[in-house]
Amino acid sequence: MRSLLVAAALLVAPITAFAESAPHEFLDDAKALLVIGACADGTPPEKVKAELVTKHCEKVKAAQEDYKKSWLSVAKPWFEAHVPKTVPKTVVYPFAGGDLSTALTVYPDADEITTLSLEPAGDPRAWSKLDNKQMKTALAVVEKEISSLYRSNFSVTMNMIGAMRGGQLPTQLIFSLTALKIHGYEPTSMRYFKLTKDGDITYLTDDDLAKIDKIKNVAAKNRALSNVEIKFKKSGGKEQTYRHVMANLDDDHIKKDPSALAHLDKKGTVAGMTKAASYLLTFGVFEKMRKYVIGHVEWMVSDSTGLPPKVGEPAGFEYETWGTYTASNMAAGGPVTPQWKELYKAQPKRELAFRFGYPDKKLNGHLIIMKKKK
């Protein structure tokens, strides 16, 4: 009898250990934030005052509709016509801020989209811990940033620092959920994760959350909940995966913490994009990311903050210019302005009816396709 009990205990122990270490599922929080922050159809949770959500959503829905009519309705068919069906289904978007929506516009059929930025996804449970006064203030921040993103088509860096790193609500996450709402997707799973130094994913468990919940500082807690994975689909469609990774992608930070770049390396050949990226990809201190783009990207779309021609062409890329470019819109782009001007001058004029990322110095929209030569 004793041997049977020991055997039974040995069988139960692994099951118990597995249950304790199972990833925590945040889908209910995702659905709550879809209604509260992203203004999807539905009834807010009982804890949240419905009038606050109604007032918040009046402005947010107006911004979303304006975005769909003025930008998405023009940009979406353009990308459908110009993105080859053969591009990799794995997408990497560095310096993305909270911009999942553009990634879904360019690559709607992607199996996996990964964005990287300095901003954390943030605590998805925060909504349940705010009183009405705190919720009103937090929703005002979210509304301001969503309106700015969708009416400017890029986020202002200083705004993101406050709204996404220290926000009472997880603004970066709400941006992502708003993108799903606009494009007609429903989340099917939401988990948070950490990366090992080798770039592997380790999902957060209830034990991890118990430790995180001891953190009182909002910004610090948001940093502890920095990386999110959302699975989503359309009715009758395939399940797709979105991951956001908080990472500083300059060389010094990658040397100290190689996990993000190691994670990207594991993806193999990818499709890429970047825009409104403060020209970071052109800076000397981002050499590792330039090498990553050169070594892994097959097809990429950007504004003038992408990989400059004098770097891309020797590496085997060819470029196709769209819209009008006269000069970069900020001093940081000054060093690469001559390269882009020369490239635009050498190519035929191709009209572009929408803005993609930064405008040029004269507020012209421009877009660049970069692809590996066959």
Label the predicted regions.
Residues 113-164, 188-212:
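Thiol-based oxidoreductase modules, predominantly thioredoxin-like and allied folds used
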Residues 140, 146-148, 169-180:
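Conserved segment of the thioredoxin-like fold in thiol-based oxidoreductases
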Residues 84, 174-186, 234:
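Short, surface-exposed basic-aromatic patches at helix termini and helix-loop junctions that form
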Residues 96-107, 153-177:
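Short, thiol/selenol-centered motifs that function as redox-active sites or metal-ligating centers
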Residues 13-17:
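N-terminal signal peptide c-region/cleavage motif recognized by signal peptidases
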Residues 1-4:
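Positively charged n-region of N-terminal signal peptides that target proteins for export
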Residues 20-150, 219-224, 231-374:
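Non-globular targeting/processing and membrane-anchoring segments
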Residues 189-242:
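Short aromatic loop motif centered on NTY/YTY
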